[in-house]
Design a protein with these regions (language model features):
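Phosphate- and other anionic-substrate recognition elements at nucleic-acid/protein interfaces
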Residues: 1-153
Length: 153
């Protein structure tokens, strides 16, 4: 079984957990090409190896203070991701942040997600690049959504 978690935001990410290697999840930052290749690979594993694939896509709406242009780009990313999931016939569920965060008892901000993620997946590097010093909440949250899919979907 393959579980995918996707944070569709500007600094979003995608995480993939294979039930055979739960301790070695794959986490990638947002890039249309990377998302396409990962989902195509997941579809290939589904078709050739008969692995079942489940995806948790974060369902978020407009946030107060966001401009029209940023909301348009967010909607564009969200639509692109949904289009890929549909085209590659990967079943997905739209899950609101409150729902998946409740699963992990996350009540605080972005740092809470990073802390929980590090506790569940201590070996995963949550930095966006080698040069970054701080862990990235988008990477952490996508991995937590993949874990949510593993537990609940």
């Amino acid at each position: 079984m393959i579980y995918i978690g996707i944070d569709p935001g500007k600094k979003g990410a995608m995480a993939v957990i294979d039930s055979e290697t739960i301790d070695l999840p794959v986490v990638i930052k947002f890039s249309p090409e990377a998302y396409r290749s990962i989902l195509l690979h997941a579809r290939g594993m589904k078709c050739t190896l008969g692995k079942e694939v489940k995806c948790c896509l974060e369902h978020v709406g407009a946030m107060p203070g966001q401009g029209v242009t940023s909301m348009f780009h967010f909607g564009e990313n969200f639509g692109y991701i949904r289009g890929l999931l549909e085209a590659f016939e990967i079943p997905y569920e739209l899950v609101r942040p409150q729902k998946w965060k409740k699963e992990f008892s996350i009540t605080g901000g972005k740092n809470s997600s990073i802390e929980v993620c590090k506790r569940l997946f201590p070996g995963v590097d949550l930095r966006r690049s080698e040069r970054c010093r701080k862990d990235d909440d988008g990477l952490a949250e996508s991995l937590l959504m993949a874990e949510y899919a593993r537990r609940r979907l």
